[in-house]
Regions:
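Mid-domain alpha/beta scaffold segments of enzyme catalytic cores
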Residues: 1-302
Length: 302
């Protein structure tokens, strides 16, 4: 559990947009969550303006498309091939699913909001071989999609100290910001404008919370920033104009660990930003909704 601090609870009547959740999704083990339908309805009942879910492979893409047949109002999705997908998909399935995923994003551009989540995760990929594979696939994605004029949603996770590749101790991937630097170099290589890129569930390092917004990137603050200072401090000095809010549910609960989060808890992201920036929650609510609408070009139905 996080250390208790005196952060005000989310105020009533806030408007909000969760720009990154995983609803619907296959139910987690030890499932304690309301049904997908109940989570969706509660989200809008409490002030949600639009809900964006992130797919990570063909299975979650198909799951989402099926859900949207019943619950598609003010609900959209991003189409991703996550770094975990690269690392964990069995070889016998990978080539066909990759081919099908590419075909979908190229032939169905009107159905999804952005490409993502995509990126690098050196927690899940711990060897140089696996990390290099993630880099190669990310480059392929940019090469094949850069002309689609879609935004990108990045999954960025640096290796922790205990996750360094001991067989290649001096490799650049082992640095505390190794993933950040690698991704910035790749974006530059493929001439991807920062204004097209959102760093989902931004986790730092702290200096990047200052420099990335100055370059034009958008940073997403998770609901866990409410109860866990390590998530809150990395955007403490980021301008509000560069921030959006997310839950990454069912993980990243505001003050608990485990698969317990729901999209309506994005209100806690608003409360966390208001606390770290010392500004009213209503101001954060209004600006982050505006930022999300602008980034994704959302059309909200009344």
């Amino acid at each position: 559990m996080p250390k208790k601090i005196n952060i005000p609870e989310p105020e009533e009547n806030l408007k909000f947009i969760d720009v990154h959740c995983h609803l619907p999704f296959h139910r987690p083990k030890r499932d304690q969550l309301p049904s997908d339908k109940v989570q969706y309805l509660n989200y809008f009942k409490l002030g949600g303006q639009y809900l964006i879910t992130s797919t990570i492979d063909m299975q979650t893409l198909n799951f989402t498309l099926d859900f949207m047949k019943k619950f598609g109002r003010n609900f959209g999705f991003t189409c991703g091939w996550a770094p975990q997908t690269v690392t964990y998909t069995p070889k016998e399935k990978y080539d066909l699913e990759w081919k099908n995923w590419l075909a979908f994003i190229q032939n169905n551009q009107d159905k999804y909001l952005a490409i993502g989540e995509i990126g690098l995760d050196f927690h899940h990929a711990k060897t140089l071989k696996k990390r290099t594979k993630q880099v190669e696939v990310l480059k392929q994605i940019f090469e094949l999609t850069k002309d689609l004029e879609k935004p990108y949603i990045l999954h960025v996770r640096n290796a922790a100290e205990h996750e360094f590749d001991r067989q290649n101790p001096k490799h650049r991937f082992n640095k505390k910001d190794g993933v950040n630097k690698e991704i910035l170099n790749i974006l530059k290589e493929f001439k991807i404008e920062p204004q097209r890129v959102m760093w989902h569930c931004f986790s730092g390092p702290e200096e990047y919370g200052r420099t990335l917004p100055n370059q034009g990137f958008t940073l997403s603050v998770p609901s866990s920033a409410y109860g866990f200072n390590r998530w809150r401090r990395v955007t403490k000095f980021s301008p509000l104009e560069s921030l959006v809010t997310e839950t990454d549910s069912y993980y990243q609960h505001p003050f608990k660990r485990g698969p317990l989060n729901v999209p309506s808890n994005v209100r806690y992201s608003i409360a966390a930003i208001a606390f770290s920036h010392n500004i009213p929650q209503k101001t954060v609510s209004e600006k982050t909704v505006e930022n999300a609408i602008k980034f994704f070009k959302l059309e909200i139905k009344g």
